[in-house]
From Swiss-Prot:
This is Phycobilisome degradation protein NblA homolog 2. Pfam families: NblA. It comes from the Bacteria. InterPro entries: NblA (IPR007574), NblA_sf (IPR036904). Signal peptide: none annotated.
Length: 60
């Protein structure tokens, strides 16, 4: 069972997010879209890695 705390950001993560928000306020639209697409790609790769790790750990 997943701990509900896993869905909350740590204080360090909240600070990191705030720093990124300030940094990206200055980006133009094209830079913002490029960053968003790059971030989504990284999230998809991470999801694939997690899925693969889970699949391999369940096999005998």
């Amino acid at each position: 069972m997943i701990n509900n705390e896993a869905f909350n950001l740590s204080l360090e993560q909240k600070f990191q997010l705030q720093c990124l928000q300030q940094e990206y306020q200055e980006l133009d639209r094209e830079q913002t879209v490029n960053y968003l697409l790059e971030t989504m790609q990284q999230i998809m790769v991470r999801d694939n890695l997690i899925r693969d790790l889970m699949k391999n750990s369940l096999l005998p």
